[in-house]
Amino acid sequence: TTKNLPATMRFFSEITGVKYPYPKYSQAFVEDFGGGMENISATTQIIEIIHDERELLDDDSESLQSHELAHQWFGDYVTTRDWGQIWLNESFATYMQAMWTEKLKGHDEFLYSDVRNNQNTVIQTWNSGNRRPVVTKYFADKDAMFDNYAYPGGGSVLHMLRKHLGDELFFRSLKHYLTRNAHQPVST
């Protein structure tokens, strides 16, 4: 389940231009937990993502593992000024997860499983009448900020930005964003 974690960490360090920012990285797998939660140098994740060799034929935990690891850069090393800016943490982690899919499984899988699904999720959310800007301070309840606009919506925005800027400028911009704002809160 965690065998690709060192490669994921190296990949994220390479594409951001920022070496993994902490001296260690730990993970805990627990029951009765909703997905994953990053903390500085430590992540808690649901135990159901641990798969044996047979289960790995049908499913893997790469998306959750890479998403939570990406938060070490986008969420911990650089974090948001307030909850209205949560998209900066979640969309970058979502898009980093997508780029790990691209590295691991190829460009077609990246486009189909991540980019297309992110865009379709946002379109369906919008069409269902749940509409809001990516950045907002107004939520129906405290959990509403962790929605389809913060995760796949923001990830879609980052993909559009990458396509507009081109890879060289996009990745140079990631490095600038992280190094300029290291250990500081940011806003859009």
Task: List where the protein language model places each region.
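Hydrophobic alpha-helical and helix-loop surface patches within well-folded domains
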Residues: 1-188
